Amino acid sequence: MLEGAVKRTLYELKWRLHHPAAFDKYRRVLANETVSPDELLARQEAARRRIVRTAMEKTAFYPKFYGAVGFEAGDSGKEGWFERLPVVTKRELRERRDGFVNPERRSSLRWFTTGGSTGEPVKTGFDESLCEEVYNWRLLNRFGVHPWDDHAYLWRDLRPRRIAKLINAAMWWPTRHLKCDVSSLDEAGIRAFLGDCRRLRPTLIYGYVGALAQVARFVLERSGKSGEGPGGAEGWRPKMVWSTSAPLSAVQRKMIETAFGAPVCDEYGSCECRWIAAQCPECKGLHVNVEHVHLEFLGDDGRAVERGEYGRTVITNLEDEAFPLIRYENNDRGRWLVDPCACGRTLPCIDSVKGRESESFVLPSGKVVSGEYLTTLFDARPDLVRGFRVVQHRDASITVEYVPAKGRDEGERRMAEALSGLVRVVGGEVPVAFKPVREIPHDRGKLRFVVREK
């Protein structure tokens, strides 16, 4: 108890020195979880007007961009005004990036480059003075985890020099952060990570989906051997596992939860706009951080799709006045959930992101097999496999690679039965093969389970 109190006191002291308003903002976002939906909508409308006004007055890009469609600052009071604004694409962001900068806030601007998983890496900016960390704290609070607790990370190590690691550890002291570099994670690295976890006993394990799945698979394959699991003989379990950076399939969720003995929280964000949405312990959808971001899902006609239908994801960062990003299409696909969450929180929910537009398959007839469908192939039978990915080859043929569940290699006939829906969708246009493999490869911890060969 004393150690926890010391950690909390020092953690809060550091944040108050670094960002005096951080905990006031945190209390506000916690209270927002029970604000009425109508009040949340009204606040979002005011925030949209404010960020659009700032963008038109302070940046070089938006006045010309909106002027091209006849939109003026005074139009924000008219019905449907926001939907009239043109959508910003990755191309505009990449080619006209400097025009998005508010010169009055340049001193607080930090640059970040997206990973380019869609083939279009983009450099974007964000205001580091906003204290977006409060959305992290709110998420942890839902699972009974504190930001000053000891945490473990399966992540790419961006501080290769020893001095940088020592400085980072000193900044966080006495809170300890166990970090495992997943850039090239092997069996020895996994054993070392699990051993460190047993000693440190972190309340949270945070990581890329691919790395979490790799460690979970290792644990399950050796679950009968003494001391090989996360807790070993000590019986330690984290309070939560936090998955990020890629869609989380039902197969992966089941495997990770079984291996670590803890609920898995799926979180959605992007390099262009972090902290978009995250799950609660109900794990039925992701609550949107409506104070921070406005979400839209659009059809091919540019209009909002019906609630429950999938559409192109368009995001507006409501807080960042240093680098306003308004109605930005990030190439993901998603949808609003129809029913409210059973947890009682009033923050609206979206479904887990099912796939990017670039991950859809195109058949010879021109028919498109959507990425959001392909990511759910084993949702009805997650017990059959420990992992999978679907590959469309250059000749348009499709191969489903899967890691059989322990002791359950069903063979191609059983797999064909389980995946009869895919065969039916393809309709005989191209061959569909099923291939058991030892593991599904990941790229430095990030997992792509829908792949279209170029």
Question: Where would I find each of the regions flagged by the language model?
Answer:
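Nucleotide 5′-phosphate-binding alpha/beta core
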Residues: M1-T113, G119-E132, W137-D150, D157, ...
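AMP-binding/adenylate-forming
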Residues: L130, D150-A211
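Short, hinge-like loop/turn segments at secondary-structure boundaries
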Residues: A169-A170, S223-G224, E282-L286, V451
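Short, structured coil segments at secondary-structure junctions
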Residues: W173, R237, A259-P263
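Adenylate-forming
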Residues: S183-G189, P202-G224, E234-R253, D266-E272
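AMP-binding/adenylate-forming catalytic core of the ANL superfamily
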Residues: I205, E319-G428
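Conserved AMP-binding/adenylate-forming
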Residues: L248-P340, E357
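Hydrophobic alpha-helical segments, especially N-terminal targeting/anchoring helices
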Residues: L298-G299, V362, P441
